[in-house]
Amino acid sequence: MSGELSSICGGLPPELCEQLAREQQIIKIKLEKRRYGREVTIIEGLDEREVNLKKLASELKSRLATGGTYKNGRIELQGDHRHRVKEILVEMGFPEENIIIVE
């Protein structure tokens, strides 16, 4: 947990602090077309200081059986996985009303 996050949460336990951080984020899931018509699912709006993007990207890639990466504060997954990503993020504790799928 970063120093900035602990200063925001004061003396709260790390688990509770992490949950509060998740509830305050607005996550956008969108689809981009790349070269040769390939589709890439983009997940934006996650705060790198509050969520471990590398760990989250790894979890999403394994659960979706796809390739992907994280860079520039966003996660990129190969293929169109917008609706499934939303379901997985809700299972992981992110509030459904804070996850927006851009059609």
UniProtKB/Swiss-Prot annotation:
CDD domains: YciH_like (cd11567). GO terms for molecular function: mRNA binding; translation initiation factor activity. GO terms for biological process: formation of translation preinitiation complex; regulation of translation; translation reinitiation. The keyword Chloroplast does not apply. InterPro entries: DENR/SUI1_TIF, SUI1, SUI1_arc, SUI1_arc_bac, SUI1_dom_sf. Keywords: Protein biosynthesis, Translation regulation. SUPFAM superfamilies: eIF1-like. It comes from the Archaea. Belongs to the SUI1 family. This is Protein translation factor SUI1 homolog.
